């Protein structure tokens, strides 16, 4: 894209090298960077982007893989956008411009009433007022309409001008849109199509943001989860009894990052779009440390966070990520984009987010919250799958959802002998690997059933934490898991990172291999009174 726009990017060579190095032997690129079979979308876009830079041998292998691919060839609108730069045969799917003018109250009613539109209205999914949708749509709509050679009428020009104004108003202080890479790249492209020059201050700031997201090895991160990571670090420090003075700066950062609405976003700059998961974790971290660290404004921040979460409970009893009553799902996974487009734009209640909110409410002993907690617990029971576990949206995946739910049920004082709780515990125990650890393959995210994989320190830690919190102390289970962690620990105290521990498009969170083993080991140490 930057080549097309004529923009000089100082990390360009590193990015090119990184992409080439991650090509599979068969010529494809996978959904993740390691141990991943070929993915049509990623292979198509990688080969198109690198045609000028790859050797003929590598390019030929990629083209042959694409020609012989027999699977689903559906492309999401952002992939279409990037491909349309060089290919005239690619049309960008985008909804009608009038959708942005539909009153928000009407849009919300579609989600609350669970309206299903006929498939002929494929764009109808964009009526749902998801935080993702609202931020991702305008660049695509602008580019798609300007690339069409048809004449722009008065109404279309007016609607495009409204979208342009919206883009200019929603750029964050760090230069991004939505604090993530894709909407930022899309907006740079849209501004270019609107006639903005590369030296325009808004484009310059956006490019600086992308540069900061790009590692020195050329890997472009989708985002930085500064609030999420810092909250996890606070809880790991607290569990391991790290000096309170070391935690104060972390706490001050979390306090500064709180939005005016009372919630937290995943990054400090995205003040207009707090989410329930980060709000729950930030509030939980502040409460856990409040007995040891007292900073002005801390109690007020906790209360505002709780109040925000209480207002965001869906009518079904659970919590989604960004919105209230935006949509709903059946028990289990959300169908991935390559099976049924549009579901990833929805924001229904999910087990992992609901669990984190419940854990926060339980830890804070919220006054008069019994009705809210019971409503959430009923939803979790409905969402539980036949094998005993839960599907988690923001981690990988069935292990993640199940462990987070069990930890939350323990925190709110649920009876661990109830059958639905025991079924979940039994499932986790049953899938322990012979090496003592736990692991799940990234393809679970796309599967209706869990796909167990090789053990990782992240997933092993999730299970150990939840089992210990549920009162499981069988040495054959817990000690075997702890032995796995200790065997994996390196000389410098760190642990190897899993090839993937997070989801949506499966990704790796580098901090997970530090904070979760630290929490698990610290809990075990306290149990053994070492």
Predicted segments, located by residue:
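Preference for long, amphipathic alpha-helical scaffolds in soluble/luminal domains
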Residues: 1-530
């Amino acid at each position: 894209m930057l080549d097309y726009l004529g923009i000089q990017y100082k990390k360009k060579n590193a990015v090119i090298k990184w992409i080439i190095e991650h090509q599979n032997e068969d010529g494809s690129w996978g959904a993740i960077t390691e141990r991943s079979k070929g993915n049509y979308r990623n292979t198509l876009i990688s080969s198109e982007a690198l045609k000028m830079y790859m050797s003929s041998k590598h390019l030929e292998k990629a083209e042959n893989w694409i020609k012989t691919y027999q699977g689903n060839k559906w492309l999401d609108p952002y992939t279409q956008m990037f491909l349309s730069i060089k290919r005239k045969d690619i049309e960008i799917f985008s909804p009608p411009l009038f959708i942005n003018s539909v009153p928000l109250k009407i849009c919300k009613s579609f989600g609350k009433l669970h309206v299903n539109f006929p498939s002929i209205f494929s764009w109808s999914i964009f009526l749902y007022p998801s935080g993702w949708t609202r931020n991702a749509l305008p660049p695509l709509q602008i580019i798609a309409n300007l690339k069409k050679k048809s004449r722009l009428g008065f109404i279309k020009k007016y609607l495009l001008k409204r979208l342009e104004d919206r883009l200019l108003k929603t750029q964050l202080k760090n230069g991004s849109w939505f604090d993530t890479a894709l909407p930022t790249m899309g907006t740079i492209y849209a501004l270019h199509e609107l006639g903005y020059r590369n030296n325009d201050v808004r484009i310059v700031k956006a490019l600086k943001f992308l540069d900061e997201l790009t590692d020195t090895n050329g890997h472009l991160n989708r985002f930085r989860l500064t609030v999420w990571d810092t909250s996890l670090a606070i809880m790991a420090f607290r569990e391991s009894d790290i000096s309170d003075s070391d935690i104060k700066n972390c706490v001050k950062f979390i306090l500064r990052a709180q939005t005016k609405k009372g919630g937290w976003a995943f990054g400090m700059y995205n003040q207009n779009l707090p989410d329930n998961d980060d709000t729950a974790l930030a509030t939980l971290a502040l409460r856990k440390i409040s007995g040891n660290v007292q900073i002005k404004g801390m109690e007020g921040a906790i209360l505002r966070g709780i109040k925000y979460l209480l207002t965001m409970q869906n009518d079904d009893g659970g919590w989604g990520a960004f919105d209230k009553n935006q949509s709903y799902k059946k028990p289990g996974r959300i169908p991935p984009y390559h099976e049924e487009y549009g579901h990833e734009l929805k924001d229904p209640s999910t087990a992992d987010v609901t669990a984190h909110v419940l854990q926060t409410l339980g830890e804070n002993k919220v006054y008069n919250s019994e009705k809210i907690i019971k409503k959430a617990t009923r939803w979790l029971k409905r969402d539980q799958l036949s094998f005993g576990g839960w599907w988690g949206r923001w981690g990988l995946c069935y292990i993640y959802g199940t462990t987070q739910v069990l930890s939350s049920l323990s925190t709110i004082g649920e009876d661990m002998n109830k059958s639905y709780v025991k079924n979940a515990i039994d499932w986790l125990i049953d899938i322990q690997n012979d090496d003592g650890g736990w692991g799940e393959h990234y393809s679970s995210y796309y599967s209706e059933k869990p796909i167990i994989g090789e053990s990782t320190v992240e997933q092993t830690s999730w299970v150990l934490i939840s089992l210990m919190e549920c009162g499981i102390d069988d040495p054959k289970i817990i000690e075997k898991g702890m032995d796995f962690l200790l065997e994996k620990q390196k000389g410098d105290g760190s642990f190897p990172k899993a090839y993937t521990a997070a989801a949506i498009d499966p990704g790796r969170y580098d901090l997970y291999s530090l904070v979760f083993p630290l929490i698990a080991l610290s809990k075990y140490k306290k149990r053994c009174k070492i």
